[in-house]
Amino acid sequence: MRIWILIFFSFIKLVSSLQYTGNGVLALDFVAKTFPNQENQLEKRDYTYSPSGITSFPLDLQSYTYYTTTLSIGRPSISYTVAIDLDMPYTWLTYYNVMAFNPAYLGIVNSGTQWSTDELRYFLCKKESDSCYFGNASSSFHFVTSPSTFFIRYDDNITVAGINVQDSLSYSHYQALPDFQFGITLKEYVPSSMLPYKGVLGLAASTEINSIDYSDSISSFSPPTFLEQLVKEDILAYPAFSMYLDNQGNGSLLLGAVDTSKYQGQFVALKQTKLTHYAVSIYSVQFLNSTFFSNYSIITDAYFQTRETYIYLPAELAYSVMDNAGAYLSEGYFALNCDEIDLEAALIFQFGCNSTIKVPISLLVIGQVSNICLLGIRPSTDSEIVLGLLFFRNAYTFYHQSQKMIAIGQAFYNATSNLSAIVDQHIPGALTCSQYPTSVASTQLVQTSHFTSTSLSAVNISESVVYSYTSSSSMPSSAIPSFNISLISQNAVANAGNSFSPLSAMVIMMMSAVFLGLGII
């Protein structure tokens, strides 16, 4: 009999405003506001102030699922919510009349149920104050013709298809990037167990994504990234940014600068081990508490991902570390009795040149059932380590795309700021590390411990349940469904008093016509 675990998440809204501080620095600050719990709580995976030259954008921590910020787009500008994504280079917004589709006809195999069209529109677009992209009467809106479409499939199986457009991106209330290129997503495939995105702000380095033509033929192209476009317009000097999140859900995304007040101890710049992913070498994972210390030597790649909630460790390592912590296992979740958590207990991640990030076990608690605390450490069948949001709450990270370097430091929860703009290839305050793995074979696990480990015990938690969203919709394998152009036009005119105009209807009709011609709708 399957035992379900109920995980209680708080829903946190972060209010943001993009501020330009001059000469290439932009900044986004977080202000945390707590909202009632969502009816549906979703799990990402089952294993799974200011010198000149700085720019900033605000971010939101959504239910321990992902960070969001707002982009002000169009003339007049409208604010749209987007998830921060370190793994994808392209930025896109969901269209207000988004439709669900099944990409199986493209040879993409999916199983299980998915979010329906009605569910996507209700969840993503129902709030007028935080709606989806309307294709409204923006005087700066125009289509991109080569290529005209984009198609993205994420590693969690979320799949989106849409058109490439340009519009004005505003910041500091009066300045703008006039021809900001991004995508408008018209079709989405979202598994029922996943949380759909209202949009994505891609912060990965430039890499190819797909386009799909009228005959469903998929090709590739390299879209201009968000950071590349800011550099091209001399808003930033270099494609570089940093991220900080404290233990209360507040934080900032800082473009073109390092905030030296947000870390303590060493700030070490590590060479990326992957060209198209933010990954570095990790040398060991250590566990310590008030009575003992254990070290696990394992040289492998560690990926920084904001679209992941948990910290994923190779299975053997995950079980060994959690065993040392005294955790037990139930339905794939590691757990501890809440009243027995050692406040001195922590995981320490060691990177190159002995740089370390300490993550207290108490900050790994993702939910509680009675006296049982569930932990955000997940075993994975992969040999790599994935560092999700629970890691970012303890680390200040900086990414220099030109140098292919990632600098890390232990997060220091400080309300002040001390910004240093990036004016060359140098990372202010950082020690450059040139260490490369030599002593231990890749992914080999070697334990040194001050005590004898015991086996993990599996227990049954009879009073607990998993609250999992399940859609009743399972779309058949077919081509992306067509829009009803006539109905869209009627809706646009009927809603003219709510941000629509005759031009809105015309723009939407043009978008639909373009997609019909391309075979996308």
From Swiss-Prot:
Glycans are attached at residues 136, 157, 250, 289, 295, 354, 414, 418, 460, 484. The active site is at residue 85. Residues 67-409 form the Peptidase A1 domain. Residues 18-500 are extracellular. It is an enzyme of class 3 (hydrolase). It is found in: Endoplasmic reticulum membrane; Secreted, Cell wall. Its main location: endoplasmic reticulum. InterPro entries: Aspartic_peptidase_A1, PEPTIDASE_A1, Peptidase_aspartic_dom_sf. GO terms for molecular function: aspartic-type endopeptidase activity. Keywords: Aspartyl protease, Cell wall, Endoplasmic reticulum, Glycoprotein, Hydrolase, Membrane, Protease, Secreted, Signal, Transmembrane, Transmembrane helix. The chain crosses the membrane at residues 501-521. Residues 1-17 form the signal peptide. Belongs to the peptidase A1 family. This is Aspartic proteinase yapsin-1. It comes from Schizosaccharomyces pombe (strain 972 / ATCC 24843).
